[in-house]
Amino acid sequence: MTISFVPIDVRSSDEADFVEFLMGNVFPLHVHSHPSVDQISTAIDRGRYDGDDHAALWIDDDIRGRLGVVILEDLADGGTMFDLRLAEIHRGQGLGTPVLRAITTRVFSALPNVNRFEGQTREDNLAMRRTFQRAGFVTEAHYREAWPADGGAVFGSVAYAILRRDWQSGTTTLLDWDDFPGVG
């Protein structure tokens, strides 16, 4: 399995395929599980997928073909974030960890200003939480009732990150959750 990333031209040559991908798959654990054409068009117009601070990339595999998309955010910042969306037909096959590791390698290799790579997921997205851990990311925060979902439900959000130095060394620097003396 060889994973590669192809920049998406969301305003021109790739726009139709990009919109079709987002509309043709359901993302039940994302804020917008089934985005409309209007929502996608508005996001494109507002620069959510391109520009100096954002990038949209197709995730391709030499055997399986197109696996999904990743949106990179805060590229000019030292803490780049991502939104990963695998196509429905590729979920549940153990692809999340190798894909996330490949994305991490791409970010740290291509963006020398990035010191940390971050992502968040809903508290009930156990598959993605395991993926984060297997890819060397560390749980950094739990935000209670911070993730709105379709239908008005609100879930907790769990934040994960990997540091450049951990990626380079292949180690994991854990947090000291009991670092506030005198409390407990």
Predicted regions and their residues:
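Acyl-donor (CoA/ACP) binding surface of acyl/acetyltransferases
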Residues: 1-24, 58-184
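Helix-loop element at the rim of GNAT/NAT acetyltransferase active sites that forms part
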Residues: 20-35
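A general structural signal for well-ordered secondary-structure junctions
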Residues: 27-28, 50, 113-114
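Active-site rim helix/loop that mediates acceptor-substrate recognition in acyltransferases
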Residues: 33-55
